Amino acid sequence: MSSRSKERVVTAFRKIFHKSSNNNNNNNNNHNNNINNNNNNDKVDGATGSSPNINNNNNNNNNNNNHDGAAAPSSAGGVAVAGGAVGSSGSSGAAKNAVVRMAAEQAVWDSPGKRRRQDHKVAPTTERQLVAAPDHTIRTRRLMKEYREMERLQAKNDAVFTVELVNDSLFEWHVRLHVIDPDSPLARDMAEMGVPAILLHLSFPDNFPFAPPFMRVVEPHIEKGYVMEGGAICMELLTPRGWASAYTVEAVIMQFAASVVKGQGRIARKPKSTKEFTRRQAEESFRSLVKTHEKYGWVTPALSDG
């Protein structure tokens, strides 16, 4: 073989080896680019949910830029298709992961515990809300107990007083006091004038028994005996200052019987007005006398005086 033939053979082998090394380098570059693109796609898809088509276009552009020569399109095309498949599968996996994360977050948001926490957020309190509302259940239970005891007492033939509800309301009572100290002027007046009993009206506030009932004389018109204008009754027991939740209605009535006798109460034979006592008059008179006695003190008669 001549030297020229040897040079041609060597040149041909160099070209073949040069093309092979270029193809290997291009394949390695394409593989690295695909890996980088897949990583970028996972980040982008997790944040923005981009489409796999964009990744395929990027892979194709990178492959086209990395190849040259006549043999490059065929080999590069194979790599590009493979890279596109890899990018597509990676992107779809990232999209699925993003969907799963969003679904998990939505599930947490829509969970019963989350909804309950959202529904039961505490509203800002106001000064009005800080004031405790009266418990009507306590008042009702206490009055039912008191009323049953009254019915038991008035079932006796010699009952000192009787009780009936006003308009079937448990919170308003009419009490008829039948028995007064027989040696008192008031008892003699009742016998002479044919008055069978002293009619009292009691109304119980919302916060009873922690506040006293309001009691007034309805009839007859009584002078002195700590009975004021409008039938108001001057008794410290009926004021918030003198009241205790342990007091019973029976004790209040018996205290009145003692007070009216101690105060020399008499039935008015010629009353100043023929009109009946009204609740409004009694309330106004009671407020006035409470102010007076808070300034000068109270005098409470003993129960034995009645």
UniProtKB/Swiss-Prot annotation:
Q: What is this protein called?
A: Ubiquitin-conjugating enzyme E2Q-like protein CG4502
Active site per the UniProt annotation: 234 (glycyl thioester intermediate)
Which EC number applies? 2.3.2.23
Its function, per the record, reads: Catalyzes the covalent attachment of ubiquitin to other proteins.
Question: Could you tell me where the Low complexity compositional bias lies?
Answer: 22-41, 53-77
Q: Which GO CC annotations does the UniProt entry carry?
A: nucleus
Q: For the region Disordered, what residue ranges are annotated?
A: 18-77
InterPro entries per the record? UBQ-conjugat_E2_core (IPR000608), UBQ-conjugating_enzyme/RWD (IPR016135)
Q: Which family does it belong to?
A: Belongs to the ubiquitin-conjugating enzyme family.
User: Which molecular function GO terms apply here?
Assistant: ATP binding; ubiquitin conjugating enzyme activity
Annotated PROSITE patterns: UBC_2 (PS50127)
**SMART domains attached here?**
UBCc (SM00212)
The entry's keywords: ATP-binding, Nucleotide-binding, Transferase, Ubl conjugation pathway
What pathway is it annotated to?
Protein modification; protein ubiquitination
One of its Pfam families is: UQ_con
Q: Which CDD domains does this one have?
A: UBCc_UBE2Q
Q: Which GO terms describe its biological process?
A: protein polyubiquitination
Q: Which chemical reaction does it catalyze?
A: S-ubiquitinyl-[E1 ubiquitin-activating enzyme]-L-cysteine + [E2 ubiquitin-conjugating enzyme]-L-cysteine = [E1 ubiquitin-activating enzyme]-L-cysteine + S-ubiquitinyl-[E2 ubiquitin-conjugating enzyme]-L-cysteine
Write down the SUPFAM superfamilies for this protein, in alphabetical order: UBC-like (SSF54495)
Where do the UBC core domain residues begin and end? 138-299
From which source organism is this entry? Drosophila melanogaster
